[in-house]
Regions:
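Gly/Ser/Thr-rich phosphate-binding loops and adjoining beta-strand/alpha-helix segments
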Residues: 51-119, 248
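Hydrophobic alpha-helical transmembrane segments
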Residues: 320-332
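Hydrophobic, membrane-inserted alpha-helices
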Residues: 306-312
Length: 356
């Protein structure tokens, strides 16, 4: 623990003092523990949702925006609307996305994936992943008001968060893993189909919103902590939120760095009498020079081009025609193609060599 190392004289308490929890408890597969082959499953078709468009950043890059709001203000506004904070922020995000929907796609719904902590439904001490999700989808009409979206989101939350629905989804998910036929298929064959299934399943999702909720720390730690924030990697747009004390941090991560949805979201909160402050939009290292692998790849590309040009020039000046230089050019191109595929797929040349 960093704070324990930084302040050894304070003798800060352990954050996980429960000695009754064993290593086996923390490593258990809670999905398999609560899976029942006889339980009902929940499968339903989802209509394709609006998808965010725009030029995306490179694989290793991410646009980051962090917004801080007072817990008291957002709680008061959500309470006045008769909804929870999570429902209110979900509706606000859907509203912000809708403002960017072009007219020719206005009939498509806005779909959000909301991760759900399954520990709230099934007791578990596991440190492994034990999360499910629900999908919230809203259609807009020309006269749709924000209150209509709030009402729709609230109703969907109440339906999707019932234990029966959550349990059915858990069984549906684990049943694929337990399928004896699929378990016999080699991973190399399954991978393309899994990727295709992920793509098809993601058609009903526009963005993701994950609310971690209230973070509580022992009193001895509180004076050393100003706030908490979290981000998640995404292929499109994801909003994460958490609160500590009287401050809630809303963290946007996006592959499409135009910032319009983030702007719309902040403006909507301000219209709802919730003050917002963008604390950080330029994190340390965000404008630093490119990482070494990117520089190395660019230098390698340049050298391949130089090699091909120089060899062709020498061949032409010496022999008066193109001969052996074509073989050098072809070899340089094949080498560049192999390295470029490795770089694009894994962004780590040494790791790719290990895989090969």
């Amino acid at each position: 623990d960093y704070l324990q190392e930084a302040h050894p004289e304070k003798e800060l308490p352990e954050l996980f003092p429960d000695e009754n929890i064993t290593g086996r408890d923390m490593e258990e597969d809670s999905f398999s523990q609560y899976y029942s082959s006889d339980a009902p499953r929940k499968r339903e078709s989802k209509k394709p949702a609006f998808q965010l468009k725009g030029e995306k950043l490179r694989q290793e890059d991410m646009s980051i925006t962090e917004v801080c709001i007072p817990v008291k203000e957002i709680h008061a506004r959500a309470k006045a609307a008769g909804v929870s904070i999570t429902v209110f922020l979900t509706a606000a995000l859907i509203w912000a996305i809708h403002e960017e929907v072009p007219q020719n796609q206005a009939k498509k719904p806005i779909g959000l994936m909301i991760p759900v902590n399954l520990r709230n439904y099934f007791p578990s001490q596991s440190m492994a992943n034990f999360f499910g999700w629900i999908e919230i989808s809203c259609y807009f009409q020309p006269d749709t008001a924000f209150e209509d979206i709030l009402r729709s989101v609230k109703e969907q939350f109440a339906k999707e968060l019932s234990k029966d629905v959550i349990e059915a989804k858990l069984n549906d998910l684990v049943s694929l893993e337990k399928n004896p036929i699929l378990r016999l298929v080699p991973l190399e064959i399954k991978t393309p189909f899994l990727l295709a299934g992920t793509t098809l399943g993601g058609r009903s999702i526009t963005a993701i919103y994950s609310n971690v909720g209230i973070i509580r720390m022992p009193e001895e730690y509180r004076k050393y902590i100003q706030r908490f924030g979290l981000f998640a990697s995404t292929d499109s747009l994801q909003l994460c939120s958490c609160s500590f004390g009287d401050e809630m941090v809303l963290s946007f991560s996006s592959k499409i760095p135009n910032g319009n949805i983030e702007r719309n979201f902040v403006e909507k909160l301000k219209k709802e009498q919730v003050s917002c402050e963008i604390r950080e939009n330029d994190f340390p290292g965000q404008k630093e020079e490119r990482k070494a692998p990117a520089k190395l790849f660019e230098s390698f590309t340049f050298l391949c081009i130089v090699l091909a040009v120089v060899c062709n020039l020498i061949d032409y000046l010496v022999d008066g025609h193109m001969g052996w230089a074509w073989f050098v050019t072809a070899g340089a191109f094949c080498t560049w193609l192999m390295v470029s595929v490795a770089y694009v797929k894994r962004r780590n040349l040494l790791k790719n060599e290990m895989w090969q």
